[in-house]
């Protein structure tokens, strides 16, 4: 993807996948390209993040597990010669309450993406989001 986003023509010949010279347009507005974020909780995901991505997107991780993962991510990044601070963590799928969100931020998340229940009307959804905002931003 990085080659497609940054080069006029790109090709790839690897062990598992090949593609001939191709062009891809339009090019991303973000330079050099949009952030690449990998999700997952597999044992090797943190190494993949260090090797290929700009961030990690774990789903509903506990603060304790996140703290452990952040330390491991920092260790792997340092070994690879990367600045650990260049790798973001965006936890998603969380309940939108202060007692859930704040411990995740304290444990090393750069951002927490909340999940909300669906409402039937725009007014109901607005009311819910205003309550969430009042709880989180005080």
Please state what every model-predicted region is.
Residues 1-138:
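Active-site-adjacent structural elements that line small-molecule/cofactor binding pockets in enzymes
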